[in-house]
From Swiss-Prot:
Name the record gives this protein: Lysozyme C
Family statement: Belongs to the glycosyl hydrolase 22 family.
Assembly information from the UniProt record: Monomer.
Keywords: Antimicrobial, Bacteriolytic enzyme, Digestion, Disulfide bond, Glycosidase, Hydrolase, Secreted, Signal
Superkingdom field: Eukaryota
GO cellular component term, pick one: extracellular region
Species name: Semnopithecus entellus (Northern plains gray langur)
One Pfam family this sequence matches: Lys
SUPFAM superfamilies registered for this protein in UniProt: Lysozyme-like
Subcellular location: Secreted
The C-type lysozyme domain, residue ranges: 19-148
GO MF term list: lysozyme activity
Active-site residues, record numbering mapped to chain: 53, 71
Miscellaneous section: Lysozyme C is capable of both hydrolysis and transglycosylation; it also shows a slight esterase activity. It acts rapidly on both peptide-substituted and unsubstituted peptidoglycan, and slowly on chitin oligosaccharides.
Length: 148
C-alpha cells in the first residue's frame, strides 16, 4: 500500500508541471514575444490580464459548464472560439491550434493566439478579467521594477 501511495505522488508530481511565471519574468518574456504595444495594448495591461486570468500559470484551465467550453493557459483562451480541444460543441478554432499547446511552459503559441484574439474588434475587452481588474486602472505596477 505504501508503494502505491508513493507511486501516486510521483505520478501526480509528473502531471502537474505548469510553469508559474514571476511577474517580471513574464513581462520580459511577453516583451520578447512582441506583445508590448501590440494592437495598442501596453505590456502592463498584458501582465495584468495574465495575473487575473491565470495567476501567471501556464497550465491553468477553467471549465465553463454553460457552453461546455474550457479556458486554457496563461491567458485563459477559450475552446469555444479560439482553440481545439476536441470536446467543445460548435467550436470555431480561430487560432488553428490545439488547446493543449496553450498549456506549454513555452508560451509562444499562447502569445500568438492572444495576438489573434486581440486583433478582433473586441480587442483586449474580450477578456472579462481584464475588464474587471485592469481596464481604467493604473496598471503600471505590473511592470514596475522589471526593466522593460
Amino acid at each position: 500500500m505504501k508503494a502505491l501511495t508513493i507511486l501516486g505522488l510521483v505520478l501526480l508530481s509528473v502531471t502537474v508541471q505548469g510553469k508559474i511565471f514571476e511577474r517580471c519574468e513574464l513581462a520580459r518574456t511577453l516583451k520578447k514575444l512582441g506583445l508590448d504595444g501590440y494592437k495598442g495594448v501596453s505590456l502592463a495591461n498584458w501582465v495584468c490580464l495574465a495575473k487575473w486570468e491565470s495567476g501567471y500559470n501556464t497550465e491553468a484551465t477553467n471549465y465553463n459548464p454553460g457552453d461546455e467550453s474550457t479556458d486554457y493557459g496563461i491567458f485563459q483562451i477559450n475552446s469555444r472560439y479560439w482553440c481545439n480541444n476536441g470536446k467543445t460543441p460548435g467550436a470555431v478554432d480561430a487560432c488553428h491550434i490545439s488547446c493543449s499547446a496553450l498549456l506549454q511552459n513555452n508560451i509562444a503559441d499562447a502569445v500568438a493566439c492572444a495576438k489573434r484574439v486581440v486583433s478582433d474588434p473586441q480587442g483586449i475587452r474580450a477578456w472579462v478579467a481584464w475588464r474587471n481588474h485592469c481596464q481604467n486602472k493604473d496598471v503600471s505596477q505590473y511592470v514596475k521594477g522589471c526593466g522593460v
